[in-house]
């Protein structure tokens, strides 16, 4: 009997339809960097609340300097000194000027600032009581930052869903926000399945291997924006598996296992989900990562990945990562895809969609993007995944690609929504 393989797009739609954004939490604005806002951010005051100087110099009435020139300079009396945080409370009248520092409010009566370097100080130190000379006119608004140049009170400075950059944290603070609401990091329970597995710090005996998947999946989970929770290694024992899975379902928002997802005699986890929950699919038309189970257990999404490291990696990238990002409130759920030219031929005889580990580089002479597959696509090898910056996507059906053919590559080294 033929296996029932569903298209990857169908599998992605099923997974995404069974996850929702997490509850809202309040965090300091600086901790929101890299996260999408859950609500619009509205300025409570004008930003900036006053017109201020763009540089150190002298604030003037432009009308006083209208006829100023090198042959007929204009001399003004310095009646005050102003710095950021120290406001000059008077009004500048005809023939008067105030020494001003960058960021200080422009006094009433003034409409321009002349930078210090082009002003001649005639006596004293150039501060209050001095006289200074100007040899050129000043334009209205010259070297003045207008009030509300960034935003007016009541303006939306950042929209819900917009990802906060480091500069955005400063913008939010300027708008009056010490903290903001974001969607909480989902807790993702991770379990490794297999009697043959030992912890990374242990020396494996004959027939044993170190559990590498848990470390990789926890790192990928963290990178996607979630909180990984490792529940350990479960041997090929139905009761032990059920105990760990039940605990993870109770404590987490999403549960991921690796191993026990193919057709072997010891694959108990899919049977557990069928018995106590609902299996929504268990085979996908892609390589690596054909044997992937997704379902609901205790109302929580469950994803069972292959024990093969490459298959687990691709399965996480294509299914778990978009789901986690949706739970965190991100709008963009997919890695960027771009086209590149093959540097070699690729033959494929299977119908499934392939995601081969590869490296894409730009030719320094032609500017063309060139993609080269890893020398081996052995799904047990981790080094090829570490060194790959993309997945070469080969669509369904047999093909015989030649060097120079243009193909699609999924840029796993770039964040979702990146502009290429």
Predicted features, each with a name:
Residues 51-53, 66-71, 89-93, 106-108, ...:
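Solvent-exposed alpha-helices and their adjacent loops that cap or buttress functional pockets
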């Amino acid at each position: 009997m033929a296996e029932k393989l569903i298209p990857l797009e169908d599998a992605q739609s099923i997974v995404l339809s069974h996850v929702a954004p997490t509850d809202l939490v309040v965090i300091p604005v600086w901790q929101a960097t890299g996260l999408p806002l859950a609500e619009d951010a509205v300025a409570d005051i004008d930003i900036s609340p006053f017109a201020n100087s763009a540089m150190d110099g002298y604030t003037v009435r432009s009308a006083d300097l209208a006829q100023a020139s090198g042959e007929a300079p204009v001399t003004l009396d310095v009646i005050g000194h102003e710095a950021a945080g120290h406001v000059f409370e008077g009004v500048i009248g005809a023939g008067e000027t105030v020494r001003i520092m960058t960021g200080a409010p422009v006094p009433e009566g003034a409409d321009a600032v002349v930078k210090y370097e082009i002003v001649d100080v005639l006596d004293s130190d150039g501060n209050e009581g001095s006289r200074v000379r100007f040899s050129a006119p000043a334009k209205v608004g010259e070297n003045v930052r207008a009030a509300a140049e960034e935003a007016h009170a009541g303006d939306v400075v950042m929209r819900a869903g917009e990802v906060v950059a480091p500069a955005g944290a400063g913008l939010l603070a300027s708008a009056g926000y010490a903290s903001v609401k974001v969607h909480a990091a989902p807790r993702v329970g991770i379990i490794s399945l297999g009697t043959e597995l030992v912890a990374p710090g242990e020396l494996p005996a004959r027939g044993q291997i170190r559990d590498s998947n848990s470390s990789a999946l926890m790192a990928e989970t963290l990178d996607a924006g979630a909180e990984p929770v490792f529940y350990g290694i479960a041997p090929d024992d139905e009761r032990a598996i059920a105990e760990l899975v039940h605990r993870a379902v109770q404590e987490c928002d999403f549960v991921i296992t690796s191993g026990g997802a193919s057709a072997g005699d010891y694959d108990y986890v899919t049977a557990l989900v069928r018995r106590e929950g609902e299996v929504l699919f268990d085979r996908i038309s892609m390589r690596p990562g054909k044997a992937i189970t997704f379902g609901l257990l205790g109302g929580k999404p469950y994803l069972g990945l292959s024990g093969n490291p490459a298959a687990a990696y691709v399965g996480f990238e294509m299914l778990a990562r978009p789901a986690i990002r949706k739970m965190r409130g991100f709008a963009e759920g997919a890695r960027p895809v771009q086209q590149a030219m093959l540097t070699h031929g690729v033959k494929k005889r299977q119908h499934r969609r392939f995601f081969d580990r590869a490296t894409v580089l730009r030719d320094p002479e032609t500017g063309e993007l060139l993609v080269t597959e890893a020398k081996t696509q052995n799904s047990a090898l981790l080094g090829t995944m570490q060194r790959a910056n993309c997945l070469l996507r080969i669509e369904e059906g047999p093909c015989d690609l030649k060097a120079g053919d243009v193909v699609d590559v999924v840029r796993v080294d770039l964040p979702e929504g990146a502009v290429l």
